[in-house]
Amino acid sequence: YMHVGNLRTALYTWLIARRHHGKFILRIEDTDQGRLVEGAVDVIYKTMAECGLDHDEGPDVGGPVGPYIQSERRELFGKYAKLLCEKGGAYYCFCQKSDEDESEAAPGEIKKHVCACRDLPLEEAKKRVEAGEPFVIRQRIPHEGTTTFHDASFGDITVENKELEDQVLLKSDGLPTYNFANVVDDHLMGITHVVRGSEYLSSAPKYNLLYEAFGWEIPTYVHCSPVMRDAQHKMSKRHGDPSYEDLIREGYLTEAVLNYVALLGWSPKGENAEREFYTLAELAEIFDISGISKSPAVFDINKLRWMNAEYMKKLSPEAFFAKAEPVLKTAVTNPAVDLRAVAALVQPRCEILSDLPERVDFIDKLPEYSTELYVHKKSKTTLENSLSSLQAILPVLEGLQTWTNENLYEALVALAAKLEVKNSVVLWPLRVAVSGKASTPGGATELCALLGKEESLARIRTGIELLSR
């Protein structure tokens, strides 16, 4: 699955590339074999394609600096790790470490390791390597002084070198660690902007020292603060927070999700400061990394629902029907009901597609309901006047020749005038009688037009019977 935070990182990277007329490169980082998840690469391709985040170079489209799968670049990483040993920025380590000791530190974790191999003369170390002795290659971090790095969001950050650990760059199986592979590949692939989560801030000083040891130009770092479930907790699939796939499955529109995710921790400036709705193309024109916030962003599902509802309203009737039809087909099985008419009715009030079955469940079958629904303070209806209204409505609708929303409304407004009551005293009881619900996707006459004359009259008679008990 694609975590919302990962989608945001991909989106920001794509926007930076498009804004500056650069190249967006898709690289598969699979050097930490223990963390590989089957099918994860397919999810990346599928999600990026769905979201319109097209890449200029990558494993599937090729490019001038491939291969774009890191595990296929093993020899290249070995070459640069050994080159770094020659330059004094790294050393061979022959300590008998367990796999756990050699494993990569989690983002933000410092794994202290003081190694005697650091002082081995290079020629002696090379002889031991040639003799077949197992080894890893570690970064040689200075014991004294400080390292300062610049981040586009967080500014300059200075770290004491004594707090940094001589991290493993090349593991005993010949594969690089994540940190080393990314520095080498970012340089070789000409990466100018590195966008990642703020949990990698603690690794940035070590990256800087690697760039300096090689004599390479340091790219622009853009560290994004985490996406939070609330003020205290990060979003986590383990705790039931939705992934991109979950949101789409629930019936959110990709365009709405992207729009919302873009604004999770980034704010437009100037004339767009108050604006909330953007297409991907519009974002690409105005996206500026100076708008990325240092503060964590809270994922507000209610705000996303609201935004999605606005996107639903903007869809053409045809486009909405295309999205809603699979859901409506399973929710409304009566062949006499026009699904396009149902879609037209629900579209203005639809927040997410997965809400639709509950919104239209009364169409196939009138649910059992309490007569208390007829009592409505605002509509000024009681059990008594609701019964009177339905009894007056029945003969009027029985005699109606043309069964359309307009004709129904006209006839019922005329009835209310004749009875000398507010329109709502007639319309609210009718709405309850034909739907059995307090909340419906349309008004009373719209529901009657949808259900047809025979079904509507049968439900009105049921309402009269219930209120007469």
Feature names for model-found ranges:
Residues 91-223, 228-235, 243, 401:
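Active-site cores that bind ATP or allylic diphosphates and position pyrophosphate for catalysis
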Residues 28-34, 198-199, 228, 304:
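Acidic, glycine-rich active-site loops and adjacent beta-strand->loop/helix elements
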Residues 1-107, 203-216, 256:
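N-terminal Rossmann-like or analogous alpha/beta NTP/dinucleotide-binding catalytic cores
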